[in-house]
C-alpha cells in the first residue's frame, strides 16, 4: 500500500511485526519511518495521530480484531480514515481458514467497530491471486466516532 500512498502523503509510517518485511520496505525508499513491532502494542504506546491508517492484508493474521480496532482508534484524529481488508467468511465471527489465515464475517467487523467507528464505505474485492485463483475479500473504510 505504501507505494500508492507516497505521492499523496507528507509523512508515511509503516509497522510490521516481521523484520524481513521491514527490510523489504526499506528497499522501497518510500517510508519516513518504519517500525518493527506488533500493531496493537506499537499504536497503543504511541502518542502520534494519523490522518489515514491503512491495514491491507493485516487482519488475515489476526483473529480477534477488537484490540486492533481500539489501538487504531487511539491513533486517529477526529477526521481520520481507517482502511483495511479482510478475507470474508459467511459464518458469524472469525476463524482460522485452511490457508492458515483468518477470515472474518461482515457482521463480526460491524459489531466490533460499532462503538468506535462509523462505516464510510465497503467493497467486495479480489485481494490477491494465489496460483491461478483469486482470493476474494472486502475492503472497509471507517471514520472515528
Located regions from the model:
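Conserved beta-strand signature within the Rossmann-like core of class I S-adenosyl-L-methionine
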Residues: 79-87
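Core SAM-dependent methyltransferase catalytic element
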Residues: 126-145
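Acceptor-substrate binding/catalytic loop of class I
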Residues: 92-108, 130
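A conserved beta-strand element that flanks and buttresses the S-adenosyl-L-methionine
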Residues: 54
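Conserved S-adenosyl-L-methionine
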Residues: 118-128
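A short glycine-rich, Lys/Arg-flanked "PGG" loop and its adjoining helix->strand segment in the class I
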Residues: 66-78
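Hydrophobic adenine-recognition pocket in adenosine-nucleotide-binding enzymes
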Residues: 58
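Class I SAM-dependent methyltransferase SAM/SAH-binding core
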Residues: 1-42
Amino acid at each position: 500500500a505504501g507505494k500508492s500512498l507516497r505521492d499523496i502523503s507528507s509523512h508515511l509510517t509503516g509497522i510490521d511485526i516481521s523484520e524481513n518485511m521491514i527490510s523489504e520496505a526499506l528497499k522501497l525508499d518510500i517510508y519516513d519511518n518504519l517500525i518493527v513491532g506488533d500493531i496493537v502494542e506499537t499504536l497503543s504506546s504511541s502518542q502520534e495521530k494519523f490522518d489515514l491508517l491503512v491495514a491491507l492484508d493485516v487482519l488475515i493474521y489476526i483473529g480477534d480484531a477488537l484490540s486492533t480496532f481500539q489501538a487504531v482508534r487511539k491513533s486517529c484524529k477526529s477526521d481520520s480514515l481507517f482502511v483495511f481488508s479482510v478475507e470474508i467468511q459467511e459464518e458469524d465471527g472469525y476463524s482460522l481458514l485452511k490457508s492458515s489465515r483468518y477470515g472474518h464475517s461482515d457482521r463480526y467487523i460491524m459489531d466490533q467497530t460499532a462503538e468506535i467507528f462509523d462505516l464510510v464505505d465497503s467493497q467486495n474485492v479480489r485481494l490477491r491471486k494465489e496460483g491461478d485463483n483469486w482470493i476474494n475479500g472486502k475492503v472497509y473504510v471507517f471514520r472515528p466516532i
